[in-house]
């Protein structure tokens, strides 16, 4: 396991290696275990510096906002859970495009459970910058990240019906459920790549700007 003091160096090296391989749009769906309440960390500083890249600004790094575990969700008022659980490092980086999760998924096949979030609402697993007071608003955009199923007695849980789907690392299973801000970040990277492919002359700053400023309120 990498010591947290070296997270910044690892991030810089990974972004540089990917850039040298031709990946100008990069996905970072991993965060620190700790939230630093928008304070700069070695991770976020390294991310900012790598994206700036000496003024070239020739990289777009899309970062997940971080997840709330289902055991930490207050089903009686999950919006307050989202407000109370702040974005994890390094997603507070100013130059990164930070992605949270919302959901349109509300179909549950198990009659004992009900979807917790209404269609178009923030995903119960998505963190926010609600408590920050430094003028930095994160995430900049949200994408589909799935919902959770709630039972008045049993534990709140994720279900395949309320999740997205992706290829599996398990060789015995070709597909598996995919949810929360990692899934949302993957969708955002896909969108960025499609915009850049159709408009190859656009700068990556323009791609980011188009994604943020063309977003609609959910």
Give, region by region, the residue ranges found by the protein language model.
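Catalytic-core regions built around general acid/base machinery
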Residues: 42-58, 85-89
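Active-site neighborhood of phospho(di)ester-bond hydrolases with catalytic His/Asp-centered motifs
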Residues: 26-29, 61-66, 99
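Subtilisin-like peptidase catalytic core
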Residues: 1-35, 39, 74, 211
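Subtilisin-like serine protease catalytic core
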Residues: 1-7, 35-37, 56-58, 92-96, ...
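Extracellular S/T/G-rich loop segment that most often corresponds to the catalytic His/Ser-adjacent loop
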Residues: 85-189
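Glycine-rich, charge-decorated loop segments at or immediately adjacent to ligand/cofactor-binding or catalytic sites
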Residues: 68-92
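Short glycine/serine- and small hydrophobic-enriched flexible loop segments
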Residues: 143, 189-197, 213-216
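Catalytic metal-binding/acid-base residues of hydrolase active sites
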Residues: 31-33, 66-70, 102-105, 147
